[in-house]
Structures are given as C-alpha cells and as structure tokens.
C-alpha cells in the first residue's frame, strides 16, 4: 500500500510515470490518415486504401496496404466503385477515405478518386456493417472538373470553373455539437468547401450546389481539411495542410477556429480565412502553423539518427471524452529518406488562449501535469516553425530557461509558468512576441529517455518547441 501511494504521488508530481515507463512503437504505412474509434480500437483509413488499427496509439497493426481487387476492405474494387472510378478515369485506387458511423449503426466510408493533377474528381460513399469491411457502393455525391460541352454544368448549375469551384477531394465528415452532420472537402483549385449532410442517409441536403467556401480558391496550395469540435472551448477547429505533399513540397499543418461549423474561421491574428487565397507567399500569412519540416540535429549534414519530419500533413484529429485528451494523426516523410512515409500520432493541447499546440514527440502515454521548477530550468534545443511554406528543414538553436525567469542563448527574453502552462516573451527585433503553451514530460523518440518539453504558439500563429537537453 505504501508503494502504491508513492507511485501515485510521483505520478502527480511528474506527470510521466506511466504503466509502460519505456514506451515502444510500431508504426503503419498510411497516407492521409483519418481516425475513427470503435470500442477500444482506433482505426486509421488512408489513401490507396491503407488501413491500420491500434489499442494504444503506439503499436499499429497494418490491415491493408493497397486498393487491389482482392483487398478485404472493398473487394473487387474496380467493379464495386465503378461509377466513381470511371468518372475520375482511374482504376485500383481511391484517396483520403474517412469512415464515420451513422445512426443506423453502419459504417459509411467517404472517399474520393481523381485524375492526378486535374480537378476531374468525385467523392463517393461505400457502406459496411463492419468497420473492417467489406464495403459496398452506396452513392456518388460530388463531382468536379466537368467539361460543359460533354458533361453539362457543374454541381451549382454553372459551367465548372477551377478557379472558384472546388476539387471533389479529401472529404472530412463530422458531427457538430447539435448532432448535425457536415462534410468539409477540397484540394487546391477553387478552395475548401463545406456541405451539410442528412444525418440519416449521409447524403448532401438538396439545393446546396458545392456548398459554402471556407478558404482558398484561385488554385491556392492547400488541401486535407478536417474539422474537430472542442467541448472545452466551444470552438470548431479547421485543420488544413498548406504546400505540396512530396518531400520537396513544404507540406505543413495549420489550424483556424470558429464558433460555427460552417464558419467563418479565423486565425490567431483575427484574420478571416475566407480571404486566404493566392500564392504560397500570400497564404503563408494565414492560420496557426503547428508543424513543418524540422530535425533535432545541429549538424551541417543530415543525421539519420536524429528525430525529424519532412512534409508532415493531411491530418485528422480526435477528442477522447474519457480522458479529455486530444490527438492529431498525420503522415510524414523524413529527412534524407525521400518519399518514404509513415503514420504518426501526437498529442494536442489547448493553451491559455484556447489554441491547439502540438507535442514535439509522438504520443507515448504521457499526461500533462505540473512539473517541479528543477525539471524546467535548464538548456533546451529550440525550434521556431515560422510561417513560411518551404522545403528547408528547420534546425534547433540552444537556449536556456534560467531560474530567475530569463531566457538566454540564441534567443532572449523572459519565461513564466502557471501550473502546466508556460508563457515565453521572446525579443524579436524591436518587439517582444508572446508565446503561450504547455510544459510536459515526453519520451524522446531518438534518445530513448524522458525529457521536459514545451510547445507554444504566438498570436501571429507561429509555433515554437523546446526540448530540454538532459545531462
């Protein structure tokens, strides 16, 4: 009993004593992962019909790897999804599926197919009684890329215009707090749109055309929308990926928020995302950038053992009502490894201003709690993710959080903490920029030990991370 009391006390003090004190990981290969939890099992569905499952978010079992005709998720896929695939002029492939359970207890897979690099795309639905399939064709609900002389008008009754009409890709289906069903979707071309769905049938309510534009247009470089409601803040959070998805494309994850599921959405500076369209330079000024390219190495050459990501993006997110934790699921490439990619899962936290910040390392079972000052004061690797869309890989600089509240080293300023929250006041040129975030212990993915980290966000939508250099 004394030992149990000691363990509980230590857990309360440190927040990192876990059932598995040295977490291990087994990752799956899933591009554009979307999350659904069924019972005690998490499932992710991704492009090429890559599917995996896990009970702890750390050890993933690959269920399926490709959309061949003998796959168990959608057997005989070319015939089963013939209507969608024939419109998109493709075979043996679907992109960015998401599965949601409707009131009839069945599982509805919203998926898309496309002629690569063009807006000739369609979003369809397949349905199954079991989360792992087999799924059967149900409906095609949105088409894009119509050639007027051949296909007639677009979904809104006018000739299709790729500058203002959406590309029917990347469906993200969600319930709002009132139980209404919505689908956000879009990729490049005319921007990101949202449609209201019938919660009983899963089909779009009539008379909406393509729905309402939330962000983008004029071929702006953004895609992979996903909306998550937070009961803690009563906001809806719109996640997006800016940039190109390949290892040279500068893919990065951004977020904006709204009090309404169909917007308008605003970034931390209060800018409306409806105005976010244009070149990469223009759109990079919008949204809170949670993560982009980085490596925790200070070497001038690539250290293949160092922890880092390249083009992380196309995420989904999940709120666990039992634990109160938020998670983000995304694919990422890696420094020096070309187009190789895997699934990753990180924990999200709400800062004092109600904005999400992302933990630097993959989820290892940690729970945020108040840390003693002696585990905070010290030297850190410091990453500033900036706002730009770039293929450059951010590297850390060294800073110190001193016991007198000062920050010294490559950046200077002041820091203070309140419970598990941290505020950094960093001098940048002639101004002081305030970053608000959280402190916690995380399992250092490459060094295999628990370290103190912080993750924080400025009112300009810039994320910074600190990883304590443990002796």
UniProtKB/Swiss-Prot annotation:
GO molecular function: arabinan endo-1,5-alpha-L-arabinosidase activity; metal ion binding
InterPro entries to which the protein is assigned, alphabetical: Abn2_C, GH43_arabinanases, Glyco_hydro_43, Glyco_hydro_beta-prop_sf
Pathway: Glycan metabolism; L-arabinan degradation
SUPFAM superfamilies with a match to the protein in the record: Arabinanase/levansucrase/invertase
Temperature impact on function: Optimum temperature is 73 degrees Celsius. It is fully heat-stable (up to 10 hours) and retains activity at temperatures up to 90 degrees Celsius. The enzyme loses its activity only after 90 minutes when incubated at 95 degrees Celsius.
Superkingdom field: Bacteria
Annotated site location: Important for substrate recognition: 314
Subcellular location: Secreted
Swiss-Prot/TrEMBL catalytic activity: Endohydrolysis of (1->5)-alpha-arabinofuranosidic linkages in (1->5)-arabinans
Record-annotated active site: 32, 223
Binding positions (substrate): 32, 117, 167-170, 187-189, 219-223
Signal peptide positions (record): 1-19
Keyword tags: Calcium, Carbohydrate metabolism, Glycosidase, Hydrolase, Metal-binding, Secreted, Signal
Activity sensitivity to pH: Optimum pH is 6.0. It retains more than 75% activity over a pH range from 4 to 7.
Gene Ontology BP terms: arabinan catabolic process
One Pfam family of this chain: GH43_C
Co-factor: note: Binds 1 Ca(2+) ion per subunit.
EC number: 3.2.1.99
Function field: Involved in the degradation of arabinan and is a key enzyme in the complete degradation of the plant cell wall. Catalyzes the internal cleavage of alpha-(1->5)-L-arabinofuranosyl residues in different arabinan-containing polysaccharides, and releases arabinotriose and arabinobiose as end products. It acts on branched arabinan (from sugar beet), but more slowly when compared to linear or debranched arabinan.
Quaternary structure, from the entry: Monomer.
Additional detail: Although it functions as an extracellular endo-alpha-(1->5)-L-arabinanase, its sequence is quite divergent from the B.subtilis enzyme.
Family recorded in the similarity comment: Belongs to the glycosyl hydrolase 43 family.
Protein name, as recorded: Extracellular endo-alpha-(1->5)-L-arabinanase
Organism: Thermotoga petrophila (strain ATCC BAA-488 / DSM 13995 / JCM 10881 / RKU-1)
